[in-house]
Regions:
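Non-heme Fe(II)/2-oxoglutarate
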Residues: 2-29, 73, 81, 97, ...
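Short, surface-exposed loop/helix-turn segments at secondary-structure junctions
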Residues: 107-108, 175-186, 237-249, 283, ...
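A short secondary-structure junction signal
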Residues: 176-181, 198-199, 209-215, 224-228, ...
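Histidine-centered catalytic micro-motifs
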Residues: 185-192, 269-273
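Short, conserved beta-strand element in jelly-roll/cupin
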Residues: 189-208, 256-259, 264, 288-292
Length: 334
């Protein structure tokens, strides 16, 4: 399958993408420890960590109910079509949305619509700073304790999440003999913003091949050295070759899981939305964590072409050049 890296504009000679495999998370947790030493070693080696049922089930279910209500009020459907509803799974497959407006050319929402809908994906960015999502993920004591144990105590105060991302099932028949069914949906990419630590929290159960978040294990080590600076978006001339190497050589893993599971990953990881062959909706909240330091203003981000209002990942005013130790400044349980 031909590689297209969505956030980097890579479209060159075809690369055969590897099919993803469903990840089986090892039980490395230790009672009373936000992150065990075994989990730290796993994160350093692989670039991600799955914390099972980190968020209380009741809180997650309440958040999903509020998300459904917001979705029903805010996402327009094509004329004459049925909107998805939480109590009727027959309405979930291949929804038909109304035409999406162009993003604003200026102002606080410059460059990205407040709600993105197209194909089988809806991104409720505008919901990202809602109190119930802030309390559920970046400001949740257990979530923040994990982020502090991995990255550091001095985290930048969280201002928003990226919102809720929903991946809807496909109404079309899938040929079980088509090998492309496990590679075609993958869109490996990295994000063009300041990146240190990210989190993905599931708002509902995500079965295998149900659109689970997908990463390329170990790619954080390769992509870290494809940048000039440790955290700021600063690709070197060999950046695109590094992405192509990751996609060609690394087998991606897909995260199936339960509501309340949270996946933490290093910000330089190559990642993708997952393969969705099922009949459920994958609901997830995405959040960003960085150490607390002076960052550029919104206008400065716009001037350098790195303004992404829906991400809580601001470019540092000063950032260290990439050196031998990619974990310089990270706590890593110490």
């Amino acid at each position: 399958m031909e590689l297209t890296v969505a956030r980097t504009g890579v479209e060159r000679s075809p690369i055969e993408k590897k099919p993803s495999v469903v990840f089986e998370a090892p039980d490395l947790a230790r009672p009373g420890e936000p992150v065990s030493s075994e989990e730290i070693r796993f994160f350093v080696d692989n670039g991600f960590l799955v914390k099972k049922r980190l968020i209380d089930k009741t809180a997650v279910e309440e958040a999903l109910g509020k998300t459904w209500a917001y979705f029903g009020d805010q996402v327009p459907m094509a004329e004459g079509t049925t909107a998805p509803t939480p109590d009727d799974a027959s309405t979930w497959a291949s929804p038909e949305w109304a035409p999406m407006p162009r993003p604003d050319d200026s102002g606080p929402y410059q460059g990205r619509q407040r709600i993105v809908y197209g194909g089988h994906t809806v991104k409720l960015h505008d919901l990202g700073d809602a109190d119930f999502l802030m309390d559920l993920v970046p400001n949740h004591p257990r979530v923040r304790a994990v982020a502090q144990a991995i990255l550091g105590d001095d985290l930048r105060p969280s201002e928003r999440t990226r919102g809720v991302y929903a991946v809807f099932p496909n109404a079309g028949e899938v040929d079980p003999d088509d090998p492309g069914r496990l590679t075609r949906p993958l869109g490996p990419h990295t994000d063009q913003v300041c990146q240190q630590l990210n989190a993905c929290a599931y708002l509902d159960d995500v079965p295998p091949r149900g659109g689970g978040f997908t990463v390329y294990p170990g790619s954080h080590k390769i992509m870290f050295r494809a940048h000039r600076f440790e955290a700021n978006w600063s690709p070197l001339p060999d950046f695109r070759d590094a992405v192509r190497r990751v996609v060609a050589e690394i087998e991606p893993v897909e995260f199936a899981g339960d509501k309340g599971d949270v996946i933490f990953w290093h910000g330089r990881m190559v990642h993708s939305s997952g393969v969705h062959l099922g009949d459920s909706i994958r609901w997830a909240v995405f959040a960003d964590f960085t150490l607390d330091g002076e960052v550029l203003s919104a206008e400065e981000h716009k001037r350098i072409g790195q303004f992404e209002w829906f991400k809580d990942a601001k470019r540092f005013a000063e950032d260290a050049p990439v050196g031998e130790d990619m974990w310089r400044g990270w706590r890593l349980g110490r």
